[in-house]
Design a protein with these regions (language model features):
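Outer-membrane beta-barrel "beta-signal"
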Residues: 227, 297, 502-504, 509, ...
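Transmembrane beta-strand segments that form the barrel wall of outer-membrane beta-barrel proteins
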Residues: 181, 204-214, 225, 236-247, ...
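C-terminal outer-membrane beta-barrel translocator/porin domains of Gram-negative envelope proteins
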Residues: 323-483, 522-527, 537-541
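Periplasmic polypeptide-binding modules associated with outer-membrane biogenesis and secretion
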Residues: 32-214, 244-253, 394, 413-414
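Residues that define the transmembrane beta-barrel architecture of outer-membrane proteins
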Residues: 190, 219-223, 251-253, 291-295, ...
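Membrane-embedded beta-strand positions of outer-membrane beta-barrel proteins
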Residues: 206-208, 227, 239-243, 269-273, ...
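Transmembrane beta-barrel wall of Gram-negative outer-membrane proteins
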Residues: 250-351
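Repeated loop/turn-to-beta-strand initiation elements of outer-membrane beta-barrel proteins
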Residues: 204-206, 233-239, 265-271, 306-311, ...
Length: 543
């Protein structure tokens, strides 16, 4: 969304020039005699009629209580007693318009109507901007988007903050939607015309990928395919389905379905479900199989959609069921059925600044235990020694993007603190492409600890066959802590790596990511101290 407030600047300049011309025509004696001192300054809403009496001196407000603030009153009062010259008038009008631009009234304009100022009285009027015309192009459902502006259109003055929030919500309601707002003055004083150009995401998108992020138990090579449908049931919803597994789908296969909808009261509801089955690679006659499933609900309440900080509060619930710990374990494998039932609350905030962009996410997860048949300490401790069904987890994520000349530094820090031993799916993962690179996927887990990932990206350059190449330097580290270590189990593990990355984006929405890292510090016995690993991901963004 891109708004162009220069409309008000052009309108302000036009009215100011007209005001100065009006003063020169209505008070010709000012050019021949000394200008009178300013004795009375009236700042009025343009819709208020000029009072019949002219009694009283000093600064007076008519119908503008939101502007009658001490700082502005003090600024305008300094002109009282000063010669009433065109320069004085222009300074007063400029001060008022600057104040309007900094408040919710940036579509309102201060100007000077025709009047006789020979007696030292000046009347400045504020014309409130009102949304008189709205034209929408490119939208799949223009009527639905038009209804979002009902609260800011009509004869009422435009609330600039409310209008900005409406424009931001139009984009937020449907992932992938982008809109651009252009404002222009209407034919009547105060009239504002809004042209909104909307670029909708494709109705149907296909995608596919291949990588080596699989578990050693089921094979590291993985393939996936996905389908995304926008505007499935309405103008602001999105549904998705993705399947993945090993290339033969004989050892690992899983699916994930999602649905998100922007609600009429400007909240976001998300539903997710997943399931999968695993056939571990075991020497005969051993056989190891398992399955898992999960459902989650998220309800996001945007708090500030515009401004220096944008933030939101998200409430949710997760249910996870598994009869194995094959994929989330560096402890002995078990096949005990467990149910996880947990509530979570998350606060996220983002702020761009002159040096980059910062994002903060704080999440509290609480499991009361006893919500399902296998949501108890017996099932949990049978899967992992010391695990309890009742727990609390606090996680804090800090992300920072900082341009450094031609380079770009992207950094992410995750902190986690748990109240007890957790099942593997809730632990902090310390190895793999999305964790400490250079280590095998799921090389280490911790109930608490920290994870720090860094990329220093060089400028992109043109490569062969139309590819765009972006090289980078990688530096990752983590500390994983076990809440209650078992005999022979290390209470802390440290992991660190450094390496090189290369992203190649090509025609046809193909992208290839190569990330090679060498281990600097390894607290995982199965991962040699100075070993290395190449992480590969090939993705097709689809039609």
């Amino acid at each position: 969304m891109n708004s162009l407030p220069s409309f008000s600047e052009r309108h302000q300049l036009r009215l100011t020039l007209m005001a100065l011309l009006s003063l020169s025509l209505n008070a010709p004696t000012l050019a021949q005699t000394a200008p009178p001192p300013l004795r009375r300054l009236i700042v009025a809403d343009a819709s208020h009629a000029m009072p019949a009496n002219h009694e009283g001196l000093g600064l007076q407000w008519q119908g503008l209580p939101e502007l009658d603030r001490p700082a502005l009153r003090s600024l305008l009062s300094t002109a009282l007693g000063q010669p009433l010259t065109p320069a004085t008038v222009q300074a007063l009008v400029t001060a008022l318009n600057s104040e309007l631009a900094a408040t919710r009234e940036r579509f309102s304009v201060a100007s000077v109507p025709d009047q006789d100022v020979s007696q030292g009285q000046l009347r400045i009027v504020v014309t409130r901007g009102r949304l008189a015309a709205l034209r929408i192009s490119g939208a799949a459902d223009a009527d639905a988007i038009s209804r979002q502006f009902d609260a800011v259109r009509g004869d009422a003055a435009i609330d600039a903050a409310a209008l900005d929030t409406t424009l931001a919500w139009i984009d937020r309601a449907l992932p992938g939607r982008n809109s651009e707002a252009r404002f222009s003055p209407g034919a009547q004083p105060g009239a504002v015309a809004l042209d909104l150009q909307v670029k909708e995401p494709d109705r149907l998108t296909l995608s596919a990928g291949a990588d080596n992020t699989g578990s050693p138990v089921t094979g590291t090579r993985r393939v996936s395919a996905g389908l995304t449908i926008n505007r499935l049931l309405g103008s602001n919803d999105q549904a998705g389905l993705r399947i993945s597994g090993d290339p033969s789908f004989g050892h690992s296969r899983s699916w994930q379905a999602s649905y998100q909808v922007g609600l009429p009261w400007r909240h976001v509801l998300s539903l997710n479900a997943n399931g999968g089955s695993i056939h571990g690679r075991m020497p005969e006659p051993l056989d190891l199989r398992g399955s898992s499933s999960g459902q989650s609900l998220r309800y996001e309440i945007p708090l500030r959609l515009t401004g220096p900080w944008t933030d939101s509060l998200t409430l949710g619930f997760d249910h996870k069921r598994s009869d194995n710990n094959l994929l989330f374990s560096d402890t002995p494998v078990t096949q005990t059925v467990t149910d996880i039932g947990q509530f979570n609350a998350s606060y996220g905030a983002e702020r761009p600044d002159a040096l980059g962009r910062t994002r903060i996410t704080a999440t509290l997860t609480v499991s009361p235990g006893g919500l399902f048949g296998h949501n108890d300490d017996d099932a949990f401790s049978a899967t992992r020694a010391g695990a309890q069904a009742r727990y609390q987890v606090v996680q804090l994520q800090l992300e920072r993007g900082t341009p450094l000349g031609a380079l770009h530094w992207q950094s992410q820090l995750t902190l986690q603190q748990a109240s007890t031993n957790l099942l593997g799916s809730e632990q902090l993962n310390g190895g793999g492409m999305s964790s400490v690179r250079g280590f095998a996927e799921g090389a280490g887990y911790g109930d608490s600890g920290w994870l720090w990932r860094n990329e220093l990206r060089a400028p992109s350059s043109a490569g062969p066959a139309g590819l765009v190449l972006t090289p980078s330097l990688l530096l990752d580290a983590a500390q994983l802590r076990v809440h209650s270590a078992q005999p022979g189990e290390p209470a802390r593990r440290h992991l660190a790596s450094a390496g090189l990355g290369l992203t190649a984006s090509g025609p046809g929405k193909l992208s290839l990511s190569l990330q090679w890292a060498q281990r600097i510090k390894s607290g995982v016995p199965s991962q040699a101290q100075h070993g290395s690993r190449l992480h590969v991901s090939l993705q097709w963004a689809g039609l």
